């Protein structure tokens, strides 16, 4: 079973005069322990897909079709549940590291801090977990 399964995900933005189709029929499967990177040109929909996965699409955008399953949980059927998993089980780092990451800390330190916060682990255990993606 996939840890994260995105099936036929489409995201639209309803503008005044037209509909902008930001992502269309996206299909992704991620197994437990895997890390996914979305790569593409500016404006290709990477951030839109990432935001849709963790249910952070702002108006006038909306997920127009498809599903995002985190284990057995369809996060768009019960959006309140994603709050429990966002940052703990699934998260994203946006393409501009200056606004997404703390430039004073290493990426490793930031991962360790996040793991410690969500899983209540010691620094050593959090470091081991961040290195081995478990």
Give the residues covered by each predicted segment:
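ABC transporter nucleotide-binding domains
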Residues: 1-134
């Amino acid at each position: 079973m996939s840890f994260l399964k995105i099936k036929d995900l489409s995201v639209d933005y309803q503008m005044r005069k037209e509909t902008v189709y930001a992502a269309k029929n996206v299909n992704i499967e991620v197994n437990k322990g895997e890390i996914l990177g979305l790569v593409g040109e500016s404006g290709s929909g990477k951030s839109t897909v990432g935001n849709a996965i963790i249910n952070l699409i702002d108006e006038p955008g909306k997920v127009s079709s498809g599903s995002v399953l985190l284990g057995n949980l369809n996060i768009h059927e019960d959006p309140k549940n994603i709050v429990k998993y966002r940052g703990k089980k699934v998260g994203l780092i946006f393409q501009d590291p200056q606004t997404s990451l703390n430039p004073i800390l290493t990426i490793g330190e930031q991962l360790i801090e996040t793991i410690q916060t969500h899983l209540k682990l010691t620094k050593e255990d959090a470091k081991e977990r961040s290195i081995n993606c478990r």
